[in-house]
Curated annotation (Swiss-Prot):
The lineage of its organism: Bacteria, Bacillati, Bacillota, Clostridia, Thermoanaerobacterales. The gene is def. This is Peptide deformylase. InterPro entries: Peptide_deformylase (IPR023635), Peptide_deformylase_sf (IPR036821). The keyword Iron-sulfur does not apply. Keywords: Hydrolase, Iron, Metal-binding, Protein biosynthesis. It catalyses: N-terminal N-formyl-L-methionyl-[peptide] + H2O = N-terminal L-methionyl-[peptide] + formate.
Amino acid sequence: MAVFQIVQYPDPILREKAREVRKITPQIERLAVNLVDTMRRSGGVGLAAPQIGVSKRVIVVEDPEKNPIVLINPEIVRLEGDKETAEEGCLSVPGVWGQVERRMCLTVRGYNLEGKQVAYLVEGFTARAFQHEIDHLDGIVFLDRATTIYKRKE
């Protein structure tokens, strides 16, 4: 559909709590497609609506097979397993990286584009990506959670 410019930190929308989606409309469906297109074109593995300037609780995360998972009003319902510290970056904070501690297993729940409630048990890097994108919906960027922040050449 369309590729949007990624909102750059410290834009205020990245610090706002995104609004809940009350109804899945054609506008929300277009938003989901645009998130997927923008994520792929930008070389990301996840993207949240506030990152393209839209204050809605919608995210997309690629699964391990590179298929996009779109979730509306996502929430983490269970964190499990060990915590692991690993490098994270963000399309909204280009050229900056940090070491962030996250749980390596979680259950996330939300709604798909058909309006059905769905849940996913995810592990490893995918679990990290879901936590990162859901943080965006709550006005949190990875810099807030990083124990070390650094720049590196792309």
